[in-house]
Design a protein with these regions (language model features):
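A short SAM/SAH-binding and catalytic strip from SAM-dependent methyltransferases
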Residues: 140-152
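Conserved SAM-binding motif I beta-strand of class I
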Residues: 96-101
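S-adenosyl-L-methionine
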Residues: 111-134
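Conserved beta-strand signature within the Rossmann-like core of class I S-adenosyl-L-methionine
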Residues: 165-177
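Conserved Class I S-adenosyl-L-methionine-dependent methyltransferase catalytic core
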Residues: 1-69
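A short, conserved alpha-helix within the catalytic core of class I
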Residues: 149-161
Length: 223
């Protein structure tokens, strides 16, 4: 869960990019500086936060490459305080998001944030309950959190995706090599081979906006 302030974030450039590439999403989202927002700034005539702009780019990537997002059932692994679920359901009212996280404090924050925002098309699910979801999950998303986990912590999530037979997986890693986390702060082994081992094949890869490059990856489960 991101709770810091990244002072080098290119707010103005990102607003210009989002206004050019995803105007509907940018117009649909507002920032009031309330729960979950550590820094709100005025840029290019709009009050924004890093989380708002990142959400525009992430949802825009899914819109371009995943058919049926408007009515998809989404599993958000590492949901944090719930900002992705809030903004996905705000821009796609027919979608539904299951929010899960291995940290209990994140799930508590997520529940309170959803209640504060009046989000009705999302629900918090404890990790041990995810495999019991009976509705079909169309896509799972993991935005940065697996880069903060060990391979041993990632594996159970992938096993759960196997159980649920989730056809698509979107991952936004910290680094292009999908480095995992280690206790001493050094880069751990890549978790990309584990994704492949569970039958997922990379079908879309995008390096993100020039002003804030990162890796957006969409995988499809092989038949």
């Amino acid at each position: 869960m991101y709770l810091g302030c990244q002072t080098d974030y290119p707010y103005a450039d990102m607003v210009r990019y989002c206004r050019r590439e995803h105007p509907r999403l940018l117009d649909a989202f507002t920032e009031d500086g309330a729960l979950g927002c550590t820094v709100a700034v005025a840029a290019e005539g709009k009050t924004v936060s890093r989380d708002l702009l990142d959400s525009v780019v992430e949802i825009g990537f899914l819109e371009r490459h995943l058919v049926g997002l408007s009515c998809a059932r989404v599993l958000d692994i590492g949901a944090g305080y719930g900002r992705f679920a809030h903004r996905l359901t705000a821009s796609h009212p027919g979608a539904f998001v299951y929010c899960t996280d291995r940290f209990a404090v994140s799930l508590t924050c997520c529940e309170r944030y959803m209640a504060h925002r009046g989000v009705t098309r999302a629900m918090v699910v404890r990790p041990q309950q995810v495999a019991s979801i009976t509705e079909r999950i169309d896509v799972a998303v993991n935005i940065h959190s697996w880069s903060e986990c060990t391979p041993e912590e990632i594996e159970p999530w992938l096993e759960t995706l196997d159980q649920l037979n989730v056809p698509y997986l979107m991952v936004v890693p910290h680094t292009p090599d999908f480095a995992s986390w280690t206790a001493n702060g050094a880069a751990g082994p890549s978790f990309l081979p584990a994704i492949h081992a569970h039958g997922y094949v990379l079908i879309r890869h995008w390096r993100g906006p020039d002003c804030w490059p990162r890796d957006f990856c969409l995988f499809e489960r092989a038949a």
